[in-house]
């Protein structure tokens, strides 16, 4: 097979997005639009990908890194001009796949079929087209009586008969590189917009005796994203694809329409995802878990057999057989080890909770290390901030912390120690000790009756 390279047009600003960011870096299911297109091209067999950048080039380059080459279109003078900017990176011969960076729904399967058809038919240009019930706004593919592609006509230039054609041009092509180079030398900007159109290059190749063909693709794949509404539509389609992929791999998703899973999330088999769940970033969920309802997990690892209910987990690691929630908040850089319980209205911040420990309810643990089999009583907190710096609390194994305890950091609690309820601990507690730091109770008998007599109650 001839060498295949790709050129992705990603220089436009996207005015209808009404954004300070270039259109193609807006995300669909957690991944920038242009990255979806790059990956589709690579999976379709492209040996090299050239991305034409313009507005916000630094942001596009930051998103894609060094996995692609960049051509710079300083002034946006049309699709043909954009391809001209990439010409220096093209090999002398072979095939070039020309794509647009705002079509995140295009799949590698469709691109492979496009390339295979191009080769099998011996075409010089093969257009990816689609059939739209309402083709308004798109260029039309005009065929002769034998079904051969005659031309692409823009809607503004189409006759009434041509406007009734429902086969539209997606703006994506496979082109013979040698023929493309020759055509680019011939195209002009002699039009109302003063731009160089790639469709003119297609017409020039045809007039040079080149063979033009078209492959009809799925309409949802070629829809470009030019507005926030179209972005949300693309997100909906991609979300459906992602959810279906997980279900095909053995994950139960109770209500796919209310479940939001990013592109790079991994989920083990026999895990159940309940409604209202949001899984983002590079999150990894193990097997036999139950996630949700109404939970959000971002860039975190969750082990096997875990339950996360009505809770948020951010950039943290969770072991096996851990119960989280309802209404818990696991903040970044936390490590929750195996068989731990994090209960309702608990916040864990940048802390390690070792195996078998329980933080059942109404507790704040920040900048702390909890040993194995620790029990944190209701309302106990680590007092980690002195107004300027954060300090560490270290709790040993098998420690029992009573209710409403303040552990004022920096402080260490030895193994097997007990902390009496209501205590404010400001000094280290030795191993095996009982620490009590509270006022002694005083009962004043008859106090109420006396106050009543004096009219004070």
Curated annotation (Swiss-Prot):
This protein's major location comes to cytoplasm
Its cofactor is: Mg(2+)
Catalysed reactions, as listed in the record: alpha-D-glucosamine 1-phosphate + acetyl-CoA = N-acetyl-alpha-D-glucosamine 1-phosphate + CoA + H(+); N-acetyl-alpha-D-glucosamine 1-phosphate + UTP + H(+) = UDP-N-acetyl-alpha-D-glucosamine + diphosphate
GO biological process terms held by the UniProt record: cell morphogenesis; cell wall organization; lipid A biosynthetic process; peptidoglycan biosynthetic process; regulation of cell shape; UDP-N-acetylglucosamine biosynthetic process
Q: Which InterPro entries match?
A: Bifunctional_GlmU, GlmU-like, GlmU/GlgC-like_hexapep, GlmU_C_LbH, Hexapep, Hexapep_transf_CS, NTP_transferase_dom, Nucleotide-diphossugar_trans
Which residues are involved in binding UDP-N-acetyl-alpha-D-glucosamine? 9-12, 23, 73, 78-79, 139, 154, 169, 226, 331, 349, 364, 375
For region Pyrophosphorylase, the annotated ranges are 1-228
Whether Oxidoreductase counts among this entry's keywords is no
Q: Where in the cell is it found?
A: Cytoplasm
The record's region (Linker) falls at 229-249
Q: Name one Pfam family in it.
A: Hexapep
Provide the residue positions that the database annotates as binding acetyl-CoA.
384-385, 421, 438
Keyword Transferase in the entry? The reply is: yes
| Single annotated GO MF | magnesium ion binding
Its family remark reads: In the N-terminal section; belongs to the N-acetylglucosamine-1-phosphate uridyltransferase family.
Would you tell me the protein name for this molecule? Bifunctional protein GlmU
| Species this protein is from | Caldanaerobacter subterraneus subsp. tengcongensis (strain DSM 15242 / JCM 11007 / NBRC 100824 / MB4)
């Amino acid at each position: 097979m001839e060498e295949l390279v790709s050129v992705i047009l990603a220089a436009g600003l996207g005015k209808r997005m009404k954004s300070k960011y270039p259109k193609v870096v807006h995300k669909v299911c957690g991944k920038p639009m242009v990255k979806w297109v790059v990956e589709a091209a690579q999976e379709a067999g492209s040996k090299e990908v050239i991305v034409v950048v313009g507005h916000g080039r630094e942001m596009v380059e930051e998103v894609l890194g060094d996995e692609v080459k960049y051509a710079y279109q300083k002034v946006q003078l049309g699709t043909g001009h954009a391809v001209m900017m990439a010409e220096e990176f093209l090999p002398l011969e072979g095939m070039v796949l020309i794509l647009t960076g705002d079509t995140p729904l295009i799949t590698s399967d469709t691109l492979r079929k496009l390339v295979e058809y191009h080769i099998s038919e011996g075409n010089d240009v093969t257009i990816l087209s689609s059939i739209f019930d309402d083709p308004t706004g798109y260029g039309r593919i005009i065929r002769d009586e034998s079904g051969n592609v005659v031309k692409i006509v823009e809607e503004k230039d189409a006759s009434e008969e041509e406007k009734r054609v429902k086969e539209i041009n997606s703006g994506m092509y496979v082109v013979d590189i040698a023929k493309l180079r020759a055509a680019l030398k011939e195209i002009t900007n002699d039009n109302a917009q003063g731009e160089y159109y790639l469709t003119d290059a297609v017409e020039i190749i045809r007039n040079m005796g080149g063979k033009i063909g078209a492959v009809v693709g799925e309409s949802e794949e070629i829809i470009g994203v030019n507005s926030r509404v179209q972005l949300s539509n693309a997100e909906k389609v991609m979300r459906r694809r992602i959810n279906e992929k997980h279900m095909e791999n053995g994950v139960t998703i109770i209500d796919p329409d209310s479940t939001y899973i990013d592109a790079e999330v991994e989920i083990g088999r026999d895990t159940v995802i309940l409604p209202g769940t949001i899984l983002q970033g590079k999150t990894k969920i193990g097997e036999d878990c139950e996630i949700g309802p109404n939970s959000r997990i971002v860039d975190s690892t969750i082990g096997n057999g875990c339950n996360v209910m009505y809770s948020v987990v951010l950039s943290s690691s969770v072991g096996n057989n851990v119960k989280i929630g309802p209404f818990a908040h696991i903040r970044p850089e936390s490590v929750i080890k195996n068989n731990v319980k994090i209960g309702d209205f608990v916040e864990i911040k940048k802390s390690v909770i070792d195996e078998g420990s329980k933080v059942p309810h109404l507790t704040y643990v920040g900048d702390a290390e909890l040993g194995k089999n620790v029990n944190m009583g209701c309302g106990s907190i680590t007092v980690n901030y002195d107004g300027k710096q954060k300090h560490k609390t270290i709790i040993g194994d098998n420690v029992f912390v009573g209710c409403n305890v303040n552990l004022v950091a920096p402080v260490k609690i030895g193994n097997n120690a007990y902390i009496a309820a209501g205590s404010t601990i400001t000094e280290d507690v030795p191993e095996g000790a009982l620490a009590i730091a509270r006022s002694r109770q005083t009962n004043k008998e008859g106090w109420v009756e006396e106050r009543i007599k004096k009219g004070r109650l």
